[in-house]
Amino acid sequence: MVDKRESYTKEDLLASGRGELFGAKGPQLPAPNMLMMDRVVKMTETGGNFDKGYVEAELDINPDLWFFGCHFIGDPVMPGCLGLDAMWQLVGFYLGWLGGEGKGRALGVGEVKFTGQVLPTAKKVTYRIHFKRIVNRRLIMGLADGEVLVDGRLIYTANDLKVGLFQDTSAF
């Protein structure tokens, strides 16, 4: 049985990356450096824009984060694809939180818009995931819209984020 808490610490997220949080058959978050959040501050089965589930997570920003040193030299900015990946990570994490089993894989996104950036001078990135639908059949899949905010200002939106849980990924 999954320990369904409303919030998770960095240690909890690292445990997920080791396959310890949702059990041996549950989905895992990536390990650092690809783990793109420091904590989950809220998870609910209701709420969000569609009242079908909501996740909010945060990443603390500091100038020493790995991506600022290489993207770009002399013009450091967090790659937008990392914010998108964080949203996919959270959709998969939510599926595990619901008790879903399998290996998480991003399946797509309908539309992404970038209207701002994360610079090394920022303090905090907030991710908000609004679930639209959960498919719990042979394929377990989450469909959600997401938002990325930096220091409280909306900078990315993603519609129709899709993540599936697979028992076998060898033919994927």
UniProtKB/Swiss-Prot annotation:
Q: A single GO CC term, please? A: cytoplasm
Biological processes annotated in GO: unsaturated fatty acid biosynthetic process
Q: Where in the cell is it found?
A: Cytoplasm
The UniProt entry, under Pfam families, shows: FabA
Top-rank taxon of the source lineage equals Bacteria
Q: Which UniProt keywords apply?
A: Cytoplasm, Fatty acid biosynthesis, Fatty acid metabolism, Isomerase, Lipid biosynthesis, Lipid metabolism, Lyase
Q: Which reaction does it catalyse?
A: a (3R)-hydroxyacyl-[ACP] = a (2E)-enoyl-[ACP] + H2O; (3R)-hydroxydecanoyl-[ACP] = (2E)-decenoyl-[ACP] + H2O; (2E)-decenoyl-[ACP] = (3Z)-decenoyl-[ACP]
Q: Name one GO molecular function term.
A: (3R)-hydroxyacyl-[acyl-carrier-protein] dehydratase activity
What InterPro entries does the annotation carry? FabA (IPR010083), FabA_FabZ (IPR013114), HotDog_dom_sf (IPR029069)
Asked if the record carries the keyword Repeat, the reply is no
Principal location class: cytoplasm
Q: Does the keyword Cytoplasm apply?
A: yes
Give the EC number. 4.2.1.59, 5.3.3.14
Per UniProt, subunit arrangement is: Homodimer.
Quote the function comment for this protein.
Necessary for the introduction of cis unsaturation into fatty acids. Catalyzes the dehydration of (3R)-3-hydroxydecanoyl-ACP to E-(2)-decenoyl-ACP and then its isomerization to Z-(3)-decenoyl-ACP. Can catalyze the dehydratase reaction for beta-hydroxyacyl-ACPs with saturated chain lengths up to 16:0, being most active on intermediate chain length.
Similarity field: Belongs to the thioester dehydratase family. FabA subfamily.
Q: Which HAMAP family does the record cross-reference, listed alphabetically?
A: FabA
Its protein name is 3-hydroxydecanoyl-[acyl-carrier-protein] dehydratase
Q: Name the source organism.
A: Escherichia coli O6:H1 (strain CFT073 / ATCC 700928 / UPEC)
